[in-house]
Amino acid sequence: MKQIQVDLANRSYPIHIGPNLFEDQELFAPVVSGKKVLVVSNETIAPLYLDKISATLSARAAQVASVILPDGEQYKTLDYLNEIFDALLEGNFARDCVLVALGGGVIGDMTGFAAACYQRGVDFIQIPTTLLSQVDSSVGGKTAVNHPLGKNMIGAFYQPKLVVIDINCLKTLPAREFAAGMAEVIKYGIIRDSELFTWLEQNVSALKALDQDAIIHVIARCCEIKAEVVSEDETEQGVRALLNLGHTFGHAIEAEMGYGNWLHGEAVAAGMVLAAQTSVTLGLIDKSILCRIAALIQAFDLPVQAPESMDFNSFIKHMRRDKKVLGGQLRLVLPLGIGAAEVSSQASDAELAEVIRRP
C-alpha cells in the first residue's frame, strides 16, 4: 500500500492506495469510530461494493446507513443533492456524523458538497471507484453540483478527512470509463511531469491490461502531483488553475452535448487537443508537441476532435461562463511543452475560431 499526504496544516489528510483496502477497518477507524455514518453511492456501484464497505465501517461506527442515487453526470443537480440532505435529516444525523462517498466523480462531488453544507460542515471520506476520480476529483476538496447553464457552478472548497483508493475497483470499471480516467492522467504529464508523459507513452499496454504495479504507480504519481498543487494553492488562485488543462473546451462540449452523452474525460481529452492546437496557433509550442499529445490520447481510445455539430458560437457561449474568466476575459490553460503550461488570455476570438474549425 502507498500513502500520500495532502499537506494543508490542520486540514491535512492521507491518501491510501492499494488492493484490498475495503476490508481494512484500521484505515477508517480514526474518522468513523463511534460516529453515525451515511454512505452515498449510485445504482451501479452500490450492488458491487456497498455491502463490503458497510460491513467494514460497521465494525467501528455507531451506525451505518446509505442513500443510493442514479448513476450519471445528468443527476449531479440540486434536486438529487436534496436526497442526501433528506436522508441526513430523516435519520437525525448530528454535526458529528460522517459522510462517505462511494463512487466516481459525480458521487464524490455531491457528497463533498453535502458535507460542506450540512449543519455548516461535517466530516467526509472519499472512496473513489473510477480511475478519473482516483487520480483527480477525489483529491483536493473541490465539491459541486451542475446548473443547466454551467458545470460545477454551485459548489465549495471542502477537504475530506481521508481518501481510500482500492485499485480492485478498476476490475469492474467499463473500458470507456477507464479511458476517460486516462485523460486526466495524461493531463498531469502535460502540465507538470514530462517523465510521466514519456512513461505513459511506453506503458500503454500495461495500463490497459490493469497491470497492478503500473496502475499503482500512475495513480500514486497523479495523486502526488495533485497533493503538491493543492498544498500550494488550495483555492485555485494560481498554479492549481493549470489542473484545468482541456477543461474550458471540455466543459463546453459536455454542456452543449448534454451531460452524460460525452464522459467528462472524453470531453477533456478533446479539449486538451484543442488547447494544444491553440498553443501551436499562438506559437507557444511546435506542432510536434501537439502530435505527441494527440497520439497518446488516441492510444487510450479517446477522442481528439470536438463533436462535428459544435461550431465556434456553440463553444464560446459556454466558455464565457468558465470560472477562470476574469474581468470579462477568457483565460485558457495552454501547454508550453510536455511538462509545462500557463494560464493565458492572449488567444483572440478569431484565433479560437480557427482552432475550433480545424479538422
Curated annotation (Swiss-Prot):
<dbReference type="GO" id="GO:0009073">
    <property type="term" value="P:aromatic amino acid family biosynthetic process"/>
</dbReference>
<dbReference type="InterPro" id="IPR056179">
    <property type="entry name" value="DHQS_C"/>
</dbReference>
<dbReference type="Pfam" id="PF24621">
    <property type="entry name" value="DHQS_C"/>
</dbReference>
<feature type="binding site">
    <location>
        <position position="142"/>
    </location>
    <ligand>
        <name>NAD(+)</name>
    </ligand>
</feature>
<feature type="binding site">
    <location>
        <position position="184"/>
    </location>
    <ligand>
        <name>Zn(2+)</name>
    </ligand>
</feature>
<dbReference type="GO" id="GO:0009423">
    <property type="term" value="P:chorismate biosynthetic process"/>
</dbReference>
<dbReference type="GO" id="GO:0003856">
    <property type="term" value="F:3-dehydroquinate synthase activity"/>
</dbReference>
<feature type="binding site">
    <location>
        <position position="264"/>
    </location>
    <ligand>
        <name>Zn(2+)</name>
    </ligand>
</feature>
<dbReference type="InterPro" id="IPR050071">
    <property type="entry name" value="Dehydroquinate_synthase"/>
</dbReference>
<protein>
    <recommendedName>
        <fullName>3-dehydroquinate synthase</fullName>
        <ecNumber>4.2.3.4</ecNumber>
    </recommendedName>
</protein>
<feature type="binding site">
    <location>
        <begin position="129"/>
        <end position="130"/>
    </location>
    <ligand>
        <name>NAD(+)</name>
    </ligand>
</feature>
<feature type="binding site">
    <location>
        <begin position="169"/>
        <end position="172"/>
    </location>
    <ligand>
        <name>NAD(+)</name>
    </ligand>
</feature>
<feature type="binding site">
    <location>
        <position position="151"/>
    </location>
    <ligand>
        <name>NAD(+)</name>
    </ligand>
</feature>
<dbReference type="Pfam" id="PF01761">
    <property type="entry name" value="DHQ_synthase"/>
</dbReference>
<dbReference type="InterPro" id="IPR030963">
    <property type="entry name" value="DHQ_synth_fam"/>
</dbReference>
<dbReference type="InterPro" id="IPR016037">
    <property type="entry name" value="DHQ_synth_AroB"/>
</dbReference>
<comment type="similarity">
    <text>Belongs to the sugar phosphate cyclases superfamily. Dehydroquinate synthase family.</text>
</comment>
<keyword id="KW-0479">Metal-binding</keyword>
<keyword id="KW-0170">Cobalt</keyword>
<feature type="binding site">
    <location>
        <begin position="71"/>
        <end position="76"/>
    </location>
    <ligand>
        <name>NAD(+)</name>
    </ligand>
</feature>
<keyword id="KW-0028">Amino-acid biosynthesis</keyword>
<feature type="binding site">
    <location>
        <begin position="105"/>
        <end position="109"/>
    </location>
    <ligand>
        <name>NAD(+)</name>
    </ligand>
</feature>
<comment type="pathway">
    <text>Metabolic intermediate biosynthesis; chorismate biosynthesis; chorismate from D-erythrose 4-phosphate and phosphoenolpyruvate: step 2/7.</text>
</comment>
<keyword id="KW-0547">Nucleotide-binding</keyword>
<dbReference type="InterPro" id="IPR030960">
    <property type="entry name" value="DHQS/DOIS_N"/>
</dbReference>
<comment type="function">
    <text>Catalyzes the conversion of 3-deoxy-D-arabino-heptulosonate 7-phosphate (DAHP) to dehydroquinate (DHQ).</text>
</comment>
<dbReference type="GO" id="GO:0008652">
    <property type="term" value="P:amino acid biosynthetic process"/>
</dbReference>
<dbReference type="GO" id="GO:0005737">
    <property type="term" value="C:cytoplasm"/>
</dbReference>
<keyword id="KW-0456">Lyase</keyword>
<dbReference type="GO" id="GO:0000166">
    <property type="term" value="F:nucleotide binding"/>
</dbReference>
<keyword id="KW-0520">NAD</keyword>
<keyword id="KW-0057">Aromatic amino acid biosynthesis</keyword>
<dbReference type="GO" id="GO:0046872">
    <property type="term" value="F:metal ion binding"/>
</dbReference>
<keyword id="KW-0862">Zinc</keyword>
<keyword id="KW-0963">Cytoplasm</keyword>
<feature type="binding site">
    <location>
        <position position="247"/>
    </location>
    <ligand>
        <name>Zn(2+)</name>
    </ligand>
</feature>
